[in-house]
Amino acid sequence: MALTKAEMSEHLFEKLGLSKRDAKDLVELFFEEVRRALENGEQVKLSGFGNFDLRDKNQRPGRNPKTGEDIPITARRVVTFRPGQKLKSRVENASPKE
């Protein structure tokens, strides 16, 4: 099961007493700020959670798996996430759910 933005909004509504509209807007605003920062080439640091970084990948050789033809994989910028120590610790110590 995955946590969705709608579920995050519902949690804010229940825990903080925000209106459903305000809770939804808060979640959307948070993710929009993360997107904006990354689009502007900034690192996003969320204390106690982790860091979103941008990494430039160089062009490299690749192969079409269907035809075996050699094709170049173009250079691109990717987003990476490095979890913080607190998040790592909580995940490692959590009991698995089935």
Curated annotation (Swiss-Prot):
Sorted UniProt keywords: DNA recombination, DNA-binding, Transcription, Transcription regulation, Translation regulation
Similarity comment: family membership: Belongs to the bacterial histone-like protein family.
Complex and partners: Heterodimer of an alpha and a beta chain.
Biological source species: Serratia proteamaculans (strain 568)
Disulfide bonds: none
Keyword Glycoprotein: no
Single GO cellular component term: cytosol
InterPro entries assigned to the protein according to its UniProt record, in alphabetical order: Hist_DNA-bd, Histone-like_DNA-bd_CS, IHF-like_DNA-bd_dom_sf, IHF_alpha
Record keyword rRNA-binding present: no
Single GO MF descriptor: DNA binding
Record GO biological process: DNA recombination; positive regulation of metabolic process; regulation of DNA-templated transcription; regulation of translation
Function, as annotated: This protein is one of the two subunits of integration host factor, a specific DNA-binding protein that functions in genetic recombination as well as in transcriptional and translational control.
Gene3D superfamilies membership: IHF-like DNA-binding proteins (4.10.520.10)
Protein name: Integration host factor subunit alpha
Residue ranges, annotated region (Disordered): 49-70
